[in-house]
């Protein structure tokens, strides 16, 4: 092609694909009440569990009472936020703990409902890893564990269940979205497009991410990744190297092929790095 961005045609088994998903690093929701477990629908199962407890049945608490998004069981002073925001005209807004619920987001009678000694607030304070261990001890909570496991699979076992989505980094938000796709029971063949998913990740986290991406592929999906990380490029089935330089001096296809084929291309900067990795692996 004469100009960057031009193309002649697209070919492949596109008729087999049913959807295309661009998985970006934007927040999973604009709502401050949104969190990873509401996004993956795990909280629906947790609310049902608490509504089934003896005290809930005695007081006629439905699952809706354990939601901080609707009136009923939530603290109405902070509307389930756990905090109060004071607007400051010439400074950053001041966020303070709600004096009514002391940051626990719910009314006291809701907090009095316990499952194995834990209130709904206690569960929201658990990390994903802690929650999976906690609920795995009860076979009746299999649905909850099934919903939470994908967060572990993408390396997010350290985040809290009730952690606001606004506190997640771009990379964490992207992995929450990836976890939601892994959790889907219906596997419509989909093309997933990721833009620099390894940004800010340690090498161990990258290895976890690659396992999750390979699960998508095993489920019949196609994954397209825009990436500079050599570990990810080496794991690819097919590489398209754009260049030769960056910015306006790039955008042209330098070479394509397997990582090994790209490594043998003399004009590819990417190939030089891949060749070093391949040589290092052979030396071991």
Listing of model-derived features with the role each one plays in the protein:
Residues 1-284:
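Conserved phosphate-binding elements of NTP-dependent enzyme cores
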């Amino acid at each position: 092609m004469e100009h960057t961005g031009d193309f002649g045609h697209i070919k492949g088994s596109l008729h087999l694909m049913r959807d295309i998903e661009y998985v970006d690093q934007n927040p999973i929701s604009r709502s401050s009440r949104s969190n990873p477990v509401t996004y993956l629908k795990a909280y629906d199962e947790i609310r049902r569990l608490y509504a089934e407890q003896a005290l809930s049945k005695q007081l006629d608490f439905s699952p809706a009472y354990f939601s901080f998004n609707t009136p009923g069981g939530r603290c109405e002073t902070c509307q389930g936020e756990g905090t109060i925001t004071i607007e400051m005209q010439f400074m950053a807004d001041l966020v303070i703990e709600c004096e009514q619920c002391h940051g626990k987001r719910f009314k006291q009678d809701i907090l009095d409902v316990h499952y194995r000694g834990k209130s709904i607030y206690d569960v929201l304070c658990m990390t994903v890893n802690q929650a999976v261990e906690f609920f795995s001890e009860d076979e009746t909570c299999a649905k909850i564990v099934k919903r939470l496991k994908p967060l572990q699979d993408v390396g997010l076992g350290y985040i809290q269940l009730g952690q606001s989505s606004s506190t997640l980094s771009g990379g964490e938000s992207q992995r929450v979205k990836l976890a939601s796709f892994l959790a889907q029971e219906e596997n419509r063949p989909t093309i997933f497009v990721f833009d620099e998913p390894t940004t800010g990740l340690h090498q161990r986290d990258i290895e976890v991410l690659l396992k999750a991406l390979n699960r998508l592929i095993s489920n019949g999906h196609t994954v397209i990744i825009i990436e500079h990380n050599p570990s990810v490029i080496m794991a690819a089935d097919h590489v398209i190297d754009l260049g030769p330089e960056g910015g306006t001096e790039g955008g042209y296809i330098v070479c394509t092929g397997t990582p090994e084929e790209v490594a043998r291309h003399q004009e590819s900067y990417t190939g030089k790095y891949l060749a070093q990795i391949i040589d290092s692996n052979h030396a071991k």
